[in-house]
Amino acid sequence: MWKASAGHAVSIAQDDAGADDWETDPDFVNDVSEKEQRWGAKTVQGSGHQEHINIHKLRENVFQEHQTLKEKELETGPKASHGYGGKFGVEQDRMDKSAVGHEYQSKLSKHCSQVDSVRGFGGKFGVQMDRVDQSAVGFEYQGKTEKHASQKDYSSGFGGKYGVQADRVDKSAVGFDYQGKTEKHESQRDYSKGFGGKYGIDKDKVDKSAVGFEYQGKTEKHESQKDYVKGFGGKFGVQTDRQDKCALGWDHQEKLQLHESQKDYKTGFGGKFGVQSERQDSAAVGFDYKEKLAKHESQQDYSKGFGGKYGVQKDRMDKNASTFEDVTQVSSAYQKTVPVEAVTSKTSNIRANFENLAKEKEQEDRRKAEAERAQRMAKERQEQEEARRKLEEQARAKTQTPPVSPAPQPTEERLPSSPVYEDAASFKAELSYRGPVSGTEPEPVYSMEAADYREASSQQGLAYATEAVYESAEAPGHYPAEDSTYDEYENDLGITAVALYDYQAAGDDEISFDPDDIITNIEMIDDGWWRGVCKGRYGLFPANYVELRQ
């Protein structure tokens, strides 16, 4: 029971101001009998005892309440009398035309044996004349056949008796009684009727321009016979109603124009004293005109303007005008061309795919460079040893056979040795000018080679052996061949290309370049990405950003 009341705030009104509940009121009357008091048959105010339930009264109350409830439901609820039609559920004006009730009796068609065939196509025995088919005939019908040609009455036909009716005869058809009227000969014609009158002329038919011999032409009068009273106008040669407006007589007096001092300037540009306001020029102003000066910027009301208060009206603001709140980042007009490979695949993914390949390629290039360096150094040492051995053999031969003449070697003969020095100096200058072509080629080779040259020259202590040294150096042809080897090694740039667009490296294994830069030693490792050298860096770059050189 305590669970049912859990969560509800039960408040009991307590009357603290009253007296003790156990005290009896002074005016209390105990009108409860002993039976009622024992069985609780009467309610005592404040005692907690209630009288017993009267079943008959309760049943009557329930019945009354049920009746009132049903009446309210009938009044407020939908009424069956208002609906399809009538008092008991049917309203005739709203009933469906195709809906029928239980009282509807359908008229069934009669059987063939019950049909009254007197009414039908027409008449008493199955035929009604007003409904019979016009093309249907009965047995009493007698067809009228056409008469033979020998039985036809030709007295009524083209016209009249014996085949011709005059009212229907053709106008152009003539009979044998027709008499044609022939035209008279010229000798039989009456020429008293014709052009006019009795003797060949009808006056009403005569040509107006045709005149006879009785015609008398009226000649024009001479100037001396003319009456000049009628002419330009009036009695003596002038008729005023026919006179030219521009023609003036001797009595005309020209009205001279008034002097400026005599003119009335009250009528003019407008109004009294020279100005008429309705004719005044809109751009003409008088001395009483006061020009309204524009206010200073400090006096102008900037609450009205481009829009709203403080200079901006939103409804009048230019759509293309931006305010100070609209901050746009300044960007260059140059737009980078994004290749298809860069859109479909990112550089980070390609870096992950080709990272190991790039490392292996770099290691392979490093191994190749070291192998070439070792091979070149070994070849140089071998050549130096051969040159040193030849020098020693020549020195021994010269010591064993001294020269007969004291001056077999003049100083002039040493002059050809100078081109050798010049060639060596030019060779070193050429090497220093060319410089390293790729990042993988080592530079210490040239310094070691120079040291070898210096070591070889220091070993040549004898003055007479100088020419032999240069001759032996020129004889095997080592240095020119080595020069061509360096040219081929440094000039072998591999596949080269020219940059069409600028590209910024997105990773450590990529290279950056600007338009018209040259990329050398290109390796086409993929269709979309190549690898090469540019600006001293070796790495990946997009293939569609460059153009191969022929």
UniProtKB/Swiss-Prot annotation:
The keyword Cell membrane applies. Residues 348-401 form a coiled coil. The modification Phosphoserine is found at S113, S150, S261, S405, S417, S418, S426, S438, S447. Residues 1-27, 344-419 are annotated as: Disordered. Residues 17-27 have a biased composition (Acidic residues). GO terms for biological process: actin cytoskeleton organization; cell motility; dendritic spine maintenance; extrinsic apoptotic signaling pathway; focal adhesion assembly; intracellular protein transport; lamellipodium organization; modification of postsynaptic actin cytoskeleton. There is a cross-link at K144, K181, K295 (Glycyl lysine isopeptide (Lys-Gly) (interchain with G-Cter in SUMO2)). The modification Phosphothreonine is found at T399, T401, T411. It is a peripheral membrane protein. It comes from the Eukaryota. There is a cross-link at K144, K181, K218 (Glycyl lysine isopeptide (Lys-Gly) (interchain with G-Cter in SUMO1)). Residues 492-550 form the SH3 domain. Residues 357-396 have a biased composition (Basic and acidic residues). It is found in: Cytoplasm, Cytoskeleton; Cell projection, Lamellipodium; Cell projection, Ruffle; Cell projection, Dendrite. Keywords: Acetylation, Cell junction, Cell membrane, Cell projection, Coated pit, Coiled coil, Cytoplasm, Cytoskeleton, Endocytosis, Endoplasmic reticulum, Isopeptide bond, Membrane, Methylation, Phosphoprotein, Repeat, SH3 domain, Synapse, Ubl conjugation. GO terms for molecular function: Arp2/3 complex binding; cadherin binding; profilin binding; proline-rich region binding. The SH3 motif may mediate binding to the cytoskeleton. This is Src substrate cortactin. It comes from Homo sapiens. The lineage of its organism: Eukaryota, Metazoa, Chordata, Craniata, Vertebrata. The gene is CTTN.
